[in-house]
Curated annotation (Swiss-Prot):
Gene that this sequence comes from: dnaA
Database matches in NCBIfam families: DnaA
Listed name of the protein: Chromosomal replication initiator protein DnaA
Chain segments carrying region Disordered: 85-109
Keywords, alphabetical: ATP-binding, Cytoplasm, DNA replication, DNA-binding, Lipid-binding, Nucleotide-binding
């Protein structure tokens, strides 16, 4: 009877969670017992146990209380024969090897002289302890850690997808570093799809296909970047299909990175799409404001540079969609201050960070006027304390666009809106960023105002 109640809990969770979330985390979880309000579950391994505790315990608890009809406390244990222990997971080193031996990391095929043009070895900066985890990347980071610790088991392949400059390559190479740190003898191969294709063409021309296959199919861990570029390349897809199968059958871990999920890669063979989707697809999205600030703070610490909080907020508010651009902006700011001798302040750094180098920006009044026009409110209402929905929405959008289109710091933007606190401005920016991906009406209104102000042409995001 109690087990039947757990099945009802699972059924309810299946209705309320996405299919990937349910299939990955809830379905493999086993019922152990329920007594005196204590619900005990068994996770297949330590990673799943930690993930359930951190991300689903409250959801499971609330659902179980509805089914069991009483207060419930959820306990998650690890299956007795699980090969991965919590102790190993938490204490394993994550630092990169100081030097990789020539045979340990293969990133070009140079050992077989297939390519004259080679890719670099794993970037020493791309390790787990230099990756800032936020809501945008938590699942991908956790999956990458799980794969690095226990390759070839649960998530094979691991398919990491997301836009340009969001950390896919960082996570992918961090997996390689981790494996080499705990197993220096591991055969780790990092390759771009372009290099795979070029090596294939060269092998065909030189009649060295067996050498090509031996090299790519010998890896314990293969990391393939930009797999979306395989689209339309029929012979490359054919060869990669057989390479994939050989590696998977041998228990080797496969990690793929793409700017889109498999289902959105055009002219991709159905069988490859199926293979790419058979493990775990983890997406990395643009970081929110707090995560961007944390990224800047961490990079500043690595560079041993002290930054005032308002400058961190300013840069984080100006570069919203690409971590490379965000870190690049900080690098330019540090170099600019070092060369000119100017202090690291918003006033001294802001003009230098104009993406087009033109120093052209909209004025606060222009932003207020255009936002008021589109939202059918007045600038005075936006500066007031009114909490009417149309006014509060317009105010938030105004703060967001003023941050994008002007050089004003958060406190100064707050002053423009009637003396609002800088934390109110931060919250407004955060809310608009969320709504841009979930509320088509807000997205349309924001784009209309951008067009009216020509913010896009003046300031690329």
């Amino acid at each position: 009877m109690l087990e039947a109640s757990w099945e009802k809990v699972q059924s309810s969770l299946k209705q309320n969670l996405s299919k990937p979330s349910y299939e990955t985390w809830i379905r493999p979880t086993e019922f152990s017992g329920f007594k005196n309000g204590e619900l005990t579950l068994i996770a297949p391994n330590s990673f799943s146990s930690a993930w359930l505790k951190n991300n689903y315990s409250q959801t499971i608890q609330e659902t179980a209380e509805e089914i069991f009809g009483e207060p419930v406390t959820v306990h998650v244990k690890v299956k007795a024969n699980a090969e991965s222990s919590d102790e190993h997971y938490s204490s394993a080193p994550i630092t990169p090897p100081l030097e990789a031996s020539p045979g340990s990391v293969d990133s070009s095929g140079s050992s077989l002289r297939l390519s004259k043009k080679t890719l670099p070895l794993l970037n020493l900066r791309y390790v787990f302890n230099r990756f800032v985890v936020g809501p945008n990347s938590r699942m991908a980071h956790a999956a990458a850690m799980a794969v690095a610790e226990s390759p070839g088991r649960e998530f094979n392949p691991l398919f990491i997808c997301g836009g340009v400059g969001l950390g896919k390559t960082h996570l992918m190479q961090a997996i390689g570093h981790y494996r080499l740190e705990i197993d220096p003898g591991a055969k780790v191969s990092y390759v771009s799809t372009e290099t795979f294709t070029n090596d294939l063409i060269l092998a065909i021309r030189q009649d060295r296909m067996q050498a090509f296959r031996d090299r790519y199919r010998a890896a314990d861990l293969i990391l393939v970047d930009d797999i979306q570029f395989i689209e339309g390349k029929e012979y490359t897809q054919e060869e990669f299909f057989h390479t994939f199968n050989a590696l998977h059958d041998a228990g080797s871990q496969i990690v793929l990175a793409s700017d889109r999920p498999p289902s959105q890669i055009p002219r991709l063979q159905e069988r490859l799409m199926s293979r790419f989707s058979m493990g775990l697809i983890a997406d990395v999205q643009a970081p929110d404001l707090e995560t961007r600030m944390a990224i800047l703070q961490k990079k500043a610490e690595q560079e041993r540079v002290g930054l005032p909080r308002d400058l961190i907020q300013f840069i984080a508010g100006r570069f919203t969609s690409n971590i490379r651009e965000l870190e690049g902006a900080l690098t330019r700011a540090i170099a600019f201050a070092s060369i000119t001798g100017l202090p690291m302040t918003v006033d001294s750094i802001a003009p230098m960070l104009d993406p087009n180098g033109q120093g052209v920006e909209v004025t606060p009044k222009q932003v207020l006027d255009k936002v008021a026009e589109v939202f059918k409110v007045t600038p005075d209402e936006m500066r007031s304390a009114s909490r009417r929905r149309p006014v509060s929405q317009a105010r938030q959008v105004g703060m967001y666009l003023m941050r994008q289109g002007t050089n004003l710091s958060l406190p100064r933007i707050g002053d423009t809106f009637g003396g609002k606190d800088h934390t109110t401005v931060m919250y407004a920016i955060e809310q608009v960023e969320k709504k841009l991906s979930s509320d088509p009406q807000i997205a349309s209104q924001v784009q209309k105002i951008r067009d009216l102000l020509q913010i896009d042409s003046r300031r690329k995001r």
